[in-house]
């Protein structure tokens, strides 16, 4: 039996799509030295090669892919988006604005200098910034503003071509910039990170291990009573001295949960809860008492829950003010915008931050009720809210502004982005509304992006060889400039205008570029995870600004809007 693969793929768009995705994802796992190609560039390269062989795909799939992707970007940004505008995130907002605005202006200037059309220029901006949101915003605005223009198809092909030619240039140059730029400035990055760690009481260890608290019980002996010196538990401050707290006391056969006024007596049996290393460091006064193995005394349900910060008594408060340990709970992680933050007593909590907390189930529930809510342990997505806000985003995208002489519409990209932000924001405030498991959100976002990249590559592949010969050299030069010059401008602005700590500044710069591989290099250079504070500060707003930059570059290009 003979199978004509070419005819099979040509006649079956779904099969073609998944063949492109499978081959592209395999290619994306390859590494060039320490740099992994990544799924996006893998799918794009495969689709470009097949596009050269005149394979094509239904554009509806491409449109659906970009819509799903940009909507999910908004949902992820929503919980922390508005706090950036209203509080101490102004520096991060300004850095993200400087990064995006400078890249946009430089791209426009180079496009005019090399006499490119808007497709090549916008594609070059998206690739140099390694930003799919720019590509999505530009592509959608092109379709909205030039629907009746016979050049639309060519401009869309050029958009894909510009992105494909400059993506690797942007990624590699930024990684090298992240490696060497910190060495060119006079402040040592590890020293800057240690300075922040000292000032804020951060854990500067990038390999911090997280253990579940354990329970051990002891019979109180004379040494421990002498050590307590008649003070009650509140006055002793057991946790601050030992890292453990007394959860239960058995006295004269009666088991009770002690309050702060309790005073230890010889013969008491106490249940201590703490991390293993805290138990190991206990004062000999505790260990000199005989360890007790009592089922009732040790029968506690230690749980670990993710608590979403929501309530006013925690939002805009420092972590130290929440006083988790006073409520018998242990903090394992602080997560913001899916980025793990250093444990910092002075970090200001934002609405939507996630605190991973361990402790007795009752105590954890009490803390969750006080500061927010426990994240839902469910794999069920609120599809009704997802679909409703998706429809709202499409409706917003239909809005058109009419001015004398020209008009322009908001477009699907901006509309869906805004609707996604609102869904994410509402989800952070209402625990039972709009729940989307993070795994499901990641899957939809990644799948939408891959479908979009496959469609982009297949449509642009036919003209790639001709375009590469005409503008290939210019694209490489322009890609380097747009990738690196805004980074330098952002560094100068942050260092000498905002006077930011260098570790935070370089983290914020990588967040403004939304580049996780470069962020890893900055963490290694600082021998700390302190830069994650800066990365989280700019990442969410940068994704939104980059999408708007893709829209704006089309609108301001002469002759497009009219």
Swiss-Prot record:
One of its GO terms (cellular component) is plasma membrane. One of its GO terms (molecular function) is monoatomic cation transmembrane transporter activity. Gene3D superfamilies: Regulator of K+ conductance, C-terminal domain. Keywords: Cell membrane, Membrane, Repeat, Transmembrane, Transmembrane helix, Transport. It is found in: Cell membrane. Residues 202-288, 290-373 form the RCK C-terminal domain. The chain crosses the membrane at residues 8-28, 32-52, 66-86, 94-114, 118-138, 158-178, 383-403, 406-426, 443-463, 477-497, 541-561. It is a multi-pass membrane protein. SUPFAM superfamilies: TrkA C-terminal domain-like (SSF116726). GO terms for biological process: potassium ion transport. Disulfide bonds: none annotated. This is Putative transport protein NT01EI_2530. It comes from the Bacteria. Belongs to the AAE transporter (TC 2.A.81) family. YbjL subfamily. Pfam families: Asp-Al_Ex, TrkA_C. It comes from Edwardsiella ictaluri (strain 93-146).
